């Protein structure tokens, strides 16, 4: 019985693991697309806070998906959220030369591991 309870708990908690949002921001000279894959952020907090960026002057679209789509030029895996015990994977799409500043930010500031798929 205990094994079934644990299995059901894992199954129920997988909802947090299968939660992501694709954020596409357009501006005058800026076009950014990224996807945040939730690791351990409470579902409502992730949906209402992390996936709703406040970017004045930008047109922002957010699409909620089960997992980040393929095609990223880089992924900051297990990125730490400042001043919180939460982690996420951040997938970057678009200009691969952005790796020059995204990789150091990922590894130093976010304490994540940079992966180039």
Regions found by a protein language model. Give the residues of each.
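N-terminal hydrophobic targeting signals that begin at the initiator methionine
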Residues: 1-2
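Mitochondrial intermembrane space
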Residues: 19-117
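Cleavable N-terminal signal peptides
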Residues: 5-6, 16
């Amino acid at each position: 019985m205990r094994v079934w309870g644990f299995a059901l708990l894992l199954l129920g908690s997988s909802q947090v693991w299968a939660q992501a949002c694709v954020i596409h921001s357009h501006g005058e000279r800026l076009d950014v697309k990224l996807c945040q894959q939730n690791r351990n952020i409470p579902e409502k907090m992730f949906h209402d806070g992390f996936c709703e960026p406040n970017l004045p002057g930008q047109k922002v679209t957010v699409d909620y998906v089960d997992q980040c789509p393929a095609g990223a030029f880089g992924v900051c895996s297990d990125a730490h959220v400042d001043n919180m015990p939460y982690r996420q994977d951040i997938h970057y799409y678009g200009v691969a030369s952005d790796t020059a500043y995204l990789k150091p930010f990922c590894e130093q500031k976010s304490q994540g591991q940079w992966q180039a798929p």
